[in-house]
Swiss-Prot record:
It catalyses: NAD(+) + (deoxyribonucleotide)n-3'-hydroxyl + 5'-phospho-(deoxyribonucleotide)m = (deoxyribonucleotide)n+m + AMP + beta-nicotinamide D-nucleotide. Keywords: DNA damage, DNA repair, DNA replication, Ligase, NAD. The gene is ligB. Its EC number is 6.5.1.2. GO terms for biological process: DNA repair; DNA replication. This is DNA ligase B. GO terms for molecular function: DNA ligase (NAD+) activity. The lineage of its organism: Bacteria, Pseudomonadati, Pseudomonadota, Gammaproteobacteria, Enterobacterales. Gene3D superfamilies: 5' to 3' exonuclease, C-terminal subdomain, DNA ligase/mRNA capping enzyme, Helix hairpin bin, Nucleic acid-binding proteins. Belongs to the NAD-dependent DNA ligase family. LigB subfamily. The keyword DNA repair applies. It comes from Salmonella dublin (strain CT_02021853).
């Protein structure tokens, strides 16, 4: 598949500002796009926290929230109003504020953060809903949603119905404030293989709905903070385990460097766990007194998240490619994203009809993942830009019998045919990729797909961009091609037969091929009535006949008299 020459680029140009990619929008459009995305996130957020229903995948919501913040920073807008936390409906104050956790981008950032810090521990970053548990005189008296970190909703009635959360405590925990994650319990969850499964939304939904008390049995608790608890981490973990919060001790490891953090992170990513995770949290055993905890100021802990299985990517352009058979394929160019260490900047949408059904235009946000063999795959459109500037696809008059000869309208299918004939399925011209064919064609103006046979070594050497070694290699490859058997040349001419069928036919010359009837073709392996008819149409095509005579003049095996 080759890129259509008159491909339409979107109006989105990009520049760097403070290390981020910013859309070069006019001020009015920037304000409109930011407002629309902000409102959509707010609507999703409201549904999520009020009704317990997830209208969008957790990962998509998180990535679009980050995209909104990026856009706001690009235009110098205040980001404090971004709806990345639950709407503040509750008025119950947290005894100790939730600080949140700083995100570290990679191992280098982890190493830098760990430098100068001691008594460090790593825990899985459990994907659920944050909560404060308050125990007084040995009894659970209050449970408060995270809210804005300072105050949230009173969840006490629901939390009392969750069997996995201890309702009574003893000793130091008899009067304590705990912070943790309410999560959807899983059996043998392998994060790398199973992904997030919208576990956060499901847990939130169970807590929000009024008619599903039995569903609360499937929720668990992972305590990640005991403000003003024992200074010694092993002692803290031991007391939590004795009180019924056993997961914290089981999944807390002392670490000395980033290598140990990385090993734990990889182990938890690939091992069976009782919960969904989205990374790891590194924390110091020594914490400030709880009176100093403030939202956004927890510098004694940091998170190293897993890369998402799918990334939200912005469409920068829509391109069209025409294959050797004349099929038009639509490709979306993307502002590059990283998926599993792979830089993804293009994704195949499919046919023009499929593109029209997807309704994708430059500026849209799409969800991209990696399919088999690391091929980028379009999963869904998660956000559409207000401006719908779409390119016009090329005419659909191309087919399997067009563009054996070069013309202005045939450029892309013609190049596709050259790439095909140079592939291992045809003549096997090593080192001849699309760029080399384009350079030769643009310089020497091929008349047809075999015009390269008439090039001299001097002409090849004078092709712009060809070094001496490359031009000599191409010259050798072109000469070796002349010795290829007849069947290889027929494949290069794109006969509509498989190699197995062509070998079974026994034809070793053009003269033999001309004598074959449709009945003969129909009897070959994987060749029915329809394909046999296509072979006859191909053989009788005027351009194919002319090419066969030209190959005969070049003394190609099987084409001479």
């Amino acid at each position: 598949m080759r890129l259509w020459k008159s491909m339409a680029w979107g109006i989105l140009l990009w520049h760097s500002q403070s290390g981020a990619l910013c859309p070069a929008w006019p001020p009015a459009r920037a304000a409109e796009e930011i407002t629309r995305l902000q409102q959509q996130l707010a609507d999703w957020n409201d549904i999520y926290w009020k009704q317990g229903v997830s209208a969008v995948d957790d990962s998509v919501y998180d990535q679009l929230s980050a995209r909104l913040v990026q856009w706001q920073r690009c235009v110098g807008q205040d980001v404090s109003s971004t709806p990345v936390s639950p709407p503040l409906n509750g008025t119950t104050m947290h005894p100790v504020a939730h600080t949140g956790v700083r995100k570290l981008a990679d191992r280098q950032a982890v190493e830098q953060w760990m430098r100068g810090r001691s008594e460090l521990w790593v825990q899985p970053k459990v994907d659920g809903v944050a909560v404060t548990l308050v125990y007084q005189n040995g009894k659970l008296t209050r449970a408060i949603s995270r809210g804005n970190g300072l105050q949230g909703e009173d969840w006490t009635p629901k939390i009392r119905l969750i069997p996995s959360i201890p309702q009574t405590t003893q000793g130091a925990l008899a009067n304590a404030v705990l912070q943790g994650e309410i999560f959807l319990q899983r059996e043998g969850h392998i994060q790398q293989r199973m992904g997030g499964m919208n576990a956060r939304s499901k847990a939130a939904g169970m807590l929000m709905r009024q008619d599903n008390a039995s569903a609360l049995n499937s929720l668990g608790i992972f305590i990640w903070a005991w403000p003003d608890g024992p200074a010694n981490m092993p002692e803290r973990l031991s007391q939590l385990a004795k009180a019924g919060f056993s997961l914290t001790k089981k999944y807390s490891l002392a670490v000395k460097d980033a290598s140990e953090v990385e090993r734990a992170r990889q182990s938890w990513l690939t091992s069976a766990l009782p919960f969904v995770t989205d990374g790891v949290v590194i924390r110091m055993a020594k914490e400030p007194a709880s009176q100093y905890w403030r939202p956004g100021q927890g510098d004694w802990l940091a998170a190293w998240k897993y890369p998402p299985v799918a990334q939200v990517a912005q469409v920068s352009a829509i391109q069209f490619s025409v294959g050797k058979s004349g099929k038009i394929t639509v490709v979306a160019s993307l502002v590059p994203v990283i998926l599993d260490d792979k830089r993804v900047q293009r994704v195949n949408i499919g046919s023009v009809k499929r593109w029209e059904a997807w309704d994708i235009a430059p500026g849209d946000q799409i969800l991209v993942s990696l399919a088999g063999q690391g091929i980028p795959r379009l999963d869904e459109v998660v956000w559409r830009s207000r401006e719908r500037s779409k390119p016009v696809p090329p005419d659909s008059h191309f087919n399997s019998l067009t563009c054996f000869y070069a013309s202005e309208t045939c450029q892309e299918q013609f190049i596709s045919r050259l790439v095909w004939l140079g592939s291992r399925s045809a003549l096997g011209l090593d080192g001849m990729g699309e760029a080399s064919w384009r350079a030769l064609h643009q310089t020497h103006r091929f008349e047809h797909i075999f015009s390269w046979l008439a090039l001299t070594s001097a002409q090849i050497a004078n092709t712009p961009g060809f070094a001496k070694g490359k031009s000599e290699q191409i010259w050798r490859q072109f000469n070796l091609a002349r010795r290829q058997p007849f069947t290889r040349w027929i494949m290069a001419m794109d006969i509509p037969l498989t190699q197995a069928a062509l070998q079974a036919s026994g034809d070793r010359s053009w003269e033999q091929l001309l004598m074959r009837t449709e009945q003969h073709w129909r009897q070959l392996p994987a060749t029915g009535e329809r394909r046999a008819g296509r072979v006859i149409d191909w053989r009788d095509n005027p351009q194919i006949k002319t090419l066969s005579r030209w190959l005969a003049a070049q003394h190609i095996p099987g084409f001479g008299s």
